[in-house]
């Protein structure tokens, strides 16, 4: 087995902690980092630290933001009667690229997953329920969890919790292929999924 110098081995190990990055890709990234100009490496490191230090979750919707509440929650021109529930912050970015949805969001930061041992208490559901109790302006919850088994399980669980409150609960149309992540979908697919949403 190749013995890399300790600083290089630690850099490779750090890259392997990123999702989807295996040993081979991590090694390639580490060697590329070593070939970069020192100023570029410094700026890269500063960007990582700045993002970790300055970004946090919005206290209302859970989306990543610098300010609290986030710009979307503060925007009075948006439709406050609709909340679109997504798994991750990158799903919000995907929906915003579409420029067709003008309501609010709620980020779960995960899904209910029996296999992974993730229960309802492990994701951002309680804050959604509290939000709905405080805000009688909300008329529709659009559930936009991914079209995976865990996404469907989470959608069903949310619908059972929310519908008794008299709030309309809808699900994105199945234009998204099974197992597909929302943040990988193109704008037209997302537009059709929102427009064709069905009541649960």
Curated annotation (Swiss-Prot):
<comment type="function">
    <text>May play a role in DNA repair. It seems to be involved in an RecBC-independent recombinational process of DNA repair. It may act with RecF and RecO.</text>
</comment>
<feature type="domain" description="Toprim">
    <location>
        <begin position="81"/>
        <end position="177"/>
    </location>
</feature>
<dbReference type="Pfam" id="PF21175">
    <property type="entry name" value="RecR_C"/>
</dbReference>
<dbReference type="GO" id="GO:0006281">
    <property type="term" value="P:DNA repair"/>
</dbReference>
<feature type="zinc finger region" description="C4-type">
    <location>
        <begin position="58"/>
        <end position="73"/>
    </location>
</feature>
<dbReference type="InterPro" id="IPR000093">
    <property type="entry name" value="DNA_Rcmb_RecR"/>
</dbReference>
<keyword id="KW-0227">DNA damage</keyword>
<dbReference type="InterPro" id="IPR023627">
    <property type="entry name" value="Rcmb_RecR"/>
</dbReference>
<comment type="similarity">
    <text>Belongs to the RecR family.</text>
</comment>
<dbReference type="Pfam" id="PF13662">
    <property type="entry name" value="Toprim_4"/>
</dbReference>
<dbReference type="Pfam" id="PF02132">
    <property type="entry name" value="RecR_ZnF"/>
</dbReference>
<dbReference type="GO" id="GO:0003677">
    <property type="term" value="F:DNA binding"/>
</dbReference>
<dbReference type="GO" id="GO:0008270">
    <property type="term" value="F:zinc ion binding"/>
</dbReference>
<dbReference type="InterPro" id="IPR034137">
    <property type="entry name" value="TOPRIM_RecR"/>
</dbReference>
<keyword id="KW-0233">DNA recombination</keyword>
<keyword id="KW-0234">DNA repair</keyword>
<dbReference type="InterPro" id="IPR015967">
    <property type="entry name" value="Rcmb_RecR_Znf"/>
</dbReference>
<dbReference type="InterPro" id="IPR006171">
    <property type="entry name" value="TOPRIM_dom"/>
</dbReference>
<keyword id="KW-0479">Metal-binding</keyword>
<keyword id="KW-0862">Zinc</keyword>
<protein>
    <recommendedName>
        <fullName>Recombination protein RecR</fullName>
    </recommendedName>
</protein>
<keyword id="KW-0863">Zinc-finger</keyword>
<dbReference type="GO" id="GO:0006310">
    <property type="term" value="P:DNA recombination"/>
</dbReference>
<dbReference type="Pfam" id="PF21176">
    <property type="entry name" value="RecR_HhH"/>
</dbReference>
